[in-house]
From Swiss-Prot:
This is Ribosomal protein L11 methyltransferase. The gene is prmA. GO terms for molecular function: protein methyltransferase activity; protein-lysine N-methyltransferase activity. Keywords: Cytoplasm, Methyltransferase, S-adenosyl-L-methionine, Transferase. One of its GO terms (cellular component) is cytoplasm. Its EC number is 2.1.1.-. The lineage of its organism: Bacteria, Thermotogati, Thermotogota, Thermotogae, Thermotogales. SUPFAM superfamilies: S-adenosyl-L-methionine-dependent methyltransferases.
Length: 264
């Protein structure tokens, strides 16, 4: 699949920009530094896809036709947390580490963002052999694949974006792991209970998730909630407390917060 890559100067704070994209249901974007060290926004449009409304007055400084494969090959393998590597181009051959391969499909989320990194950190810290894991808002499937490779017995990954579901399925096949990937509007299509629910989405969506999360968890379950801008942390904590969840551990990188929660 071919995409039009547009490069625009970053006019607003990163967290505000991410929120706007999520509100529009647009996920093919990246925030990077140009050769001068200035942050720029890259977005990727499919043929005939319109520019998100809030960007229509932004200056476009460059554009070109590209493919996801072109984008992926620019990335070198990297260690997302100690002992776990993201390998977009299959350059790593190690038996002493967990390696997550990424297919050059149609997704642009690769684990570079701190919210993904913190989620993987807590999965590695708290996941026990044989745990069951639910990944809500799975995107490319990195968290679900990591959970399975860390020893989870059953992993379910859901997303409301059909494109994300396709990409996650491709990455699951690429990594030869047993993960069920399916479409679901938050927990609408989820059945059963899980030992760990991990979700790397926006604070407002976490608030909605918390309304129903007790149905898919048990007394000893754990929540790992990431993608929370620090100024909205208290909002998530209040909603969690209303439903019987307390913060066990907190981690922050830049303005992004990840919370680990247990039942009170």
């Amino acid at each position: 699949m071919r995409f039009k890559e547009l490069i625009l100067p970053l006019k607003i704070e990163e967290e505000e920009l991410v929120e706007k994209f999520y509100e529009e249901g647009f996920f093919n974007f990246a925030i990077e530094e140009d050769k001068k060290g200035k942050k720029v926004l890259k977005i990727y449009l499919r043929e005939g896809e319109p520019l998100p409304d809030f960007l229509k007055d932004w200056e476009i400084v460059d554009e070109k036709i590209t493919t996801p494969k072109d984008w992926i090959v620019e990335l070198e393998p990297f260690e997302i947390v100690e002992g776990i590597f993201i390998d977009p181009t299959e350059k790593i051959n190690r038996r002493d580490a967990i390696v997550i391969k990424l297919s050059p499909g149609v997704a642009f989320g690769t684990g570079l963002h701190p919210t993904t990194r913190m989620s993987v950190f807590f999965l590695k810290k708290y996941l026990k052999e044989g745990n069951t894991v639910l990944d809500v808002g799975c995107g490319t499937g990195i968290l679900a694949i990591a959970a399975k490779k860390l020893g989870a017995s059953r992993v379910v990954a859901v997303d409301v974006d059909e494109q994300a579901v396709e990409v996650a399925e491709e990455n699951v096949r690429k990594n030869d792991v047993d993960v069920l990937v399916k479409w679901s509007d938050l927990l609408s299509e989820v059945e059963g209970t899980f030992d760990i629910v991990v979700s790397n989405i926006l604070a407002e969506i976490h608030v909605k998730l918390l309304e129903d999360v007790n149905r898919v968890t048990h007394r000893d379950s754990m929540l790992i909630l990431s993608g929370i801008v620090d100024r909205k942390e208290d909002m998530v904590k209040r909603k969690a407390s209303e439903h019987g969840w307390n913060v066990l551990e907190r981690k922050q990188e830049r303005e992004w917060v990840t919370l680990v929660m247990k039942r009170s």
